[in-house]
């Protein structure tokens, strides 16, 4: 049985990452980046495109006080001394999927994020020349759901533009 609910408030904020509440309520929305000319924003691309903000798979490691092991992740991405991320936790900059549909391709985006984490961590633990920092560390937590930033951009009474921030 479907129950219809009506909510009233002076302001609603849809923080689902996909604009799901607004979408289900029938709100207008855009996906991707608008052209520079649409809102007069100099940082926007000249032509519109489908690129969106990405999703991040968060993680952190912990010092276990003694050496820990991690399997060699040879079937993942190949990292080396130049392209590895020498970090002990994931941050929001570990973002992926900007060129995919953040709704329809979300599982693929999340899986790729996991592959990046495990591939990079394997390199740090097993191959990095100066890996003293990682010898006693182990992955302590890896999110199984990626954190979304934005897929649908809801269009309301006012649209925030670059000029509002500059």
Predicted regions located by residue number:
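Flavin (FAD/FMN)-binding glycine-rich loop and adjacent Rossmann-like elements that form
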Residues: 1-166
């Amino acid at each position: 049985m479907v129950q219809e609910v009506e909510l009233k408030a002076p302001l609603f904020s849809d923080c689902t990452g996909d604009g799901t509440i607004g979408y289900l309520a029938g709100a207008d929305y855009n996906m991707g980046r608008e052209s520079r000319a649409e809102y007069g924003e100099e940082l926007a691309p000249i032509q519109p495109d489908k690129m969106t903000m990405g999703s991040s798979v968060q993680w952190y490691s912990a010092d276990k006080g003694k050496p820990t092991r991690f399997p060699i992740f040879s079937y993942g991405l190949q990292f080396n001394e130049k392209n590895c991320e020498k970090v002990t936790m994931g941050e929001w900059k570990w973002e992926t999927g900007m060129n995919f549909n953040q709704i329809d391709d979300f599982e693929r985006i999340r899986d790729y994020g996991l592959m990046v984490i495990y591939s990079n961590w394997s390199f740090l633990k097993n191959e990095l020349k100066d890996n003293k920092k990682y010898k006693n560390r182990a992955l302590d937590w890896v999110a199984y759901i990626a954190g979304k930033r934005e897929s649908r951009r809801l269009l309301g009474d006012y649209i925030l533009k670059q000029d509002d921030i500059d």
